[in-house]
Amino acid sequence: DLFSRKVVGWSMSHRMTANLVNQALLSALGSRAPERGLIWHTDRGSQYASDSHRQLLKENGLVQSMSRKGNCWDNAVAESFFKTLKTGLIYHKQYKTREEAQDDIFDYIEVFYNKSRLHSSNDYRSPIDYEEMRFVA
């Protein structure tokens, strides 16, 4: 979520496919139930341009936005998250199984990143704290 930097939908697989990104989108839709017209921004990967992904966006009233060709800055928030995930967790461990890695990534996102990691764009609050502060006030 660009507003709070909260990871609202995600999925894991050994391959980057349209099904994987569709599962992540369904996860996000389940956690947020956004209004029609919400902008769904991604890079230009073929999985995001797939017919199944475009159809899922259309069925849920979302507007697709894709980065300009060769411009990583258009997707800087997502790129920054993945850099943080890799440098803060993945590069420091050796996992024996895919399941062990998935469990660790789940904890990183749901326990640490969304609940505890501070963001300068959130007045140095975690995504969840920032949302609570902004929506309760």
Describe each region flagged by the PLM.
Residues 1-137:
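Charged DNA-binding/catalytic regions of mobile-element recombinases
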